[in-house]
């Protein structure tokens, strides 16, 4: 049975939460391989003159960490003109990605795949497109700290399980409730790098 890509632009946050509840799963050692495979696909469809770097970030990039089964990929590109946004959208659609909350005015874009009627048993993927020089280093600082600190990693896993239970159908509240912990860890890594 063929599945249709999800059109996130037509859904409210409440609808998204009900269709795709938060679920945290134990660490999967295949996540790194899945990222590498996705990186190859993305590199093949996006012009090498446009793409400056591709990073795996988010919880699936941290060995041993429980996570939503979503591979987050950061792609750094040249200036995001309207024309380039259209080209990127078209090219990512060829490998199954749908547009997620992208505004005409943003200097960033987000795409997703794996969101369909089989969501409960599907690996999902997000591609975060950022302009060169606008890559959010805080996400990399956070990732790097947790990669090196088992205690903080365990603490974060416990927090995520608790919040996923509390905010199972509200992705925005789930994300917001993690902010204090993420900010604290990010600052620790920044201070470590000084």
PLM features per residue range, with description:
Residues 1-55, 183:
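Helical scaffold of the NTase/Pol beta-like nucleotidyltransferase catalytic core
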Residues 14-19, 65-68, 119:
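Short, flexible turn/loop "capping" segments at secondary-structure junctions
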Residues 20-30, 74-80, 142-146:
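Short histidine-centered catalytic/ligand-binding loop motif
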Residues 41-71, 76-81:
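Active-site nucleotide-donor binding segment shared across nucleotidyl transfer reactions
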Residues 85-95:
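Short amphipathic alpha-helices in soluble, non-transmembrane regions
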Residues 95-134:
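Conserved catalytic core of two-metal-ion nucleotidyltransferases
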Residues 135-194:
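Catalytic cores of NTP-dependent nucleotidyl/adenyl transfer enzymes across multiple folds
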